[in-house]
Amino acid sequence: MEQKKKKIIKFVLNFFVYILIIGGITVGLPKLLAWSLNIPYPMATITSGSMWPALKEGDLVFIKGVQGKNDLNIGDIIVYRNNLNNTFTIHRVVELGEDALTTRGDANFSKDAPVRYEDVVGKTLTVFGRPARVPNAGFITVYANKKLNQ
């Protein structure tokens, strides 16, 4: 009987330790990334197929801050605030103008409306020239968005 109590106590303690570790990672990792990448939103989930094949729906991407238009180049994948519907959009830069830039999703046929430089939140972190992403890590966000928009 005493042995069984010890096993139960050990199980409960291990459970709480794991919860604390997972909670620390869940809360701490985004804060650490926000600080190190100089951006309030260091991660984003791809919620549509507009950036296929570079980014797939459900991918989690890492975003780094930009200081201004001098940090942006044609071909960069950026995150910008879409003021029409108060959402964020992740598309590739196709033109750089004096006061605004133009983007387009890789899978889209037409360009987006011009984006003011002050609406650019950041650009995707790249590794060996490719966007840093975790495939399917954002599937919960995609699922929740689809359920909310039904």
What are these regions (language model features)?
Residues 1-68, 131-150:
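Protein maturation boundaries and topogenic segments
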Residues 32-33, 74, 80:
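Short, positively charged
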Residues 62, 79-80:
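Short catalytic-loop micro-motif centered on adjacent basic/acidic residues
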Residues 72-73, 119:
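Short amphipathic alpha-helical leader/targeting segments
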Residues 66-71, 84-87:
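Short, charged beta-turn/beta-strand-edge "cap" motif at the junction between a beta-strand
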Residues 3, 36, 40-47, 81-150:
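Acidic/glycine-rich C-terminal interaction modules and beta/coil loop segments
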Residues 58-60, 73-76:
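Structural motif
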